[in-house]
Amino acid sequence: MSKMSSLVSSLILAGSVSVASAWEALPNKAPEPANNPTTPEKVKLGQILYHDPRLSSTGTVSCASCHNTMLGGEDNRPNSMGVNGQTGGRSAPTVWNSAFNEVQFWDGRAASLEDQAAGPVTNPIEMGMKSWDDVVARLKSIEGYQALFEKAFGKDSISKDNATKAIAAYERTLITPNSPYDKYVKGNKNAMTEQQVRGMEKFAEIGCGGCHSGAAFNGPGMFQKFPVFSNGFFNAKYKFVKDKGRAEVTKKESDKNFWKVPTLRNIAITAPYFHNGSVKTLDEAVKIMAKMQLDKDLSKDEIADIVAFLNALTGEFPKQQMPALPATPGTTVN
């Protein structure tokens, strides 16, 4: 047995034992940092900023454009569209339950939701602002934001730091508890179907929980190489290894094709799948993961059972509605 096969076998065994003995329900409240306690005023401001396209250079792209809370927290596109019709090389991850991630972005380059909120605004492809100084100047020019920031942070408080704190505070309210799975592990054994229970058992048995662990099924703070096992057919078809992943951030060869483990919460409604959005169906994604991560060939029935279980991870979504944005009468976005 090769060292890699031995390692994967150990992960499978550890994953199947730990997951089977420690199924966790999703908390109703997300953790928050000491320097940014959640308040209703921050959440209100954050929701408005999140939906305001004027944080982009063209006035056409908001956070919600790619991470739509009216959907599964993303945009169901392989690659999201930013300013001037540009597209990036990665699929937008869901914002729902992102508060349970220890790091953000596919490559983990942001250590917090606050850090993450700062990035897309000045990304030339995504929202295209030249600098946060320009963002702050634009916010200060919109009269309604003065009062909103003052209620959330005090007088003369429009700043990059406070804007990102407000967006993060809003994102920490985007929690989807009470899925059939959550109800099941809390004791309601009728909450999941027999097929979903079989899929849950198979998920643990083959070692999926070696990476997708914890209440959010995201292996909090964990990076994993993908793919572990090379497969010429899948690689040629889906081009998984074209993007170097975390190595793009660290510049370390040892981090090549390593990725933050994504959440499986609400996975049934967040197609397409993988970092490049190349796989259209959940059935195909399960088949690929079993083969390329665990070196397992699953039958159609086993795939169907696991997919049924993953559908049981779709939670209850808090009601969302588009907020009224502060008006800028008589002016345009330049």
Placement of each model-derived feature along the sequence:
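Class I S-adenosyl-L-methionine-dependent methyltransferase module
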Residues: 121, 125-126
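C-terminal capping alpha-helices of c-type cytochrome domains
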Residues: 132-177, 268, 278-334
